[in-house]
């Protein structure tokens, strides 16, 4: 904002990935819009009930009106008042199983078709990392197999991404993340994944040994076991 006021530079385009669809995001989005900053949201979390629904017939109806999800081609939710572009499967009758990582890759491919081969395995990493369950998951895994990745390798990469993200927090780790994902430094990719995965397993084992003795297990009436861990 200071550069805009002092030097007339363009305001940034904010792209929110895996975040931004819910009513909890409205205050932050509203603040950005007050400064006339353009905002794009790519998210797969439940955005709240639809305010309006546009159907295949072209008719727009109230969000509370019952209809088949398959008939919805566009919907609006509360945050749409504060964003310029909102991509979320729920807006077209879908659900959270098409994850933000998969959505972002699809959008990237639409913007620049030349990256298709470079990124075609990324949606599979995203959906497996988020433990999604949908027909599209198998389609993405099949696409990734064309680059030589099997399901276990993809899961391993997803675990490594989560592990590294924990340590990076809000730091810029683009170089190492690109290496883990296999979109850059391809000669380093296998070694990086193996090294991080071994360390990840060690940390998980340590945490499990510390946590399991302190878990209280309760069997519910329906036969499901409910495990409680006091982390205080």
Model-flagged regions — what are they?
Residues 10, 171, 175-232:
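Gly/His-enriched, cation/cofactor- and phosphate-binding structural elements
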């Amino acid at each position: 904002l200071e550069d805009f006021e002092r030097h007339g530079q363009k305001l940034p385009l904010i792209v929110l990935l895996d975040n931004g669809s819910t009513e909890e995001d409205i205050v932050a989005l509203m603040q950005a819009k007050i400064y006339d900053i353009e905002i794009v949201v790519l998210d797969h979390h439940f955005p709240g009930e639809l305010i309006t629904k546009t159907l295949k017939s072209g008719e727009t109806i109230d969000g509370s009106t019952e209809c088949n999800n398959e008939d919805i081609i566009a919907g609006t939710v509360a945050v749409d008042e504060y964003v310029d572009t909102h991509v979320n499967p729920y807006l077209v009758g879908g659900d959270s199983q098409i994850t933000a990582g998969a959505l972002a890759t699809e959008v990237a491919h639409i913007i620049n078709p030349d990256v298709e081969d470079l990124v075609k395995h990324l949606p599979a990493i995203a959906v497996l990392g988020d433990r999604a369950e949908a027909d599209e998951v198998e389609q993405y895994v099949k696409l990734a197999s064309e680059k030589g990745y099997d399901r276990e390798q993809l899961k391993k990469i997803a675990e490594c991404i989560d592990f590294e993200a924990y340590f990076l927090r809000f730091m810029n780790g683009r170089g190492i993340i690109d290496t883990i994902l296999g979109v850059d430094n391809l000669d380093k990719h296998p070694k990086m994944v193996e090294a991080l995965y071994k360390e990840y397993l060690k940390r998980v084992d340590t945490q499990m040994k510390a946590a399991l003795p302190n878990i209280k297990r309760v069997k519910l009436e329906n036969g499901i076991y409910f495990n409680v861990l006091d982390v205080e």
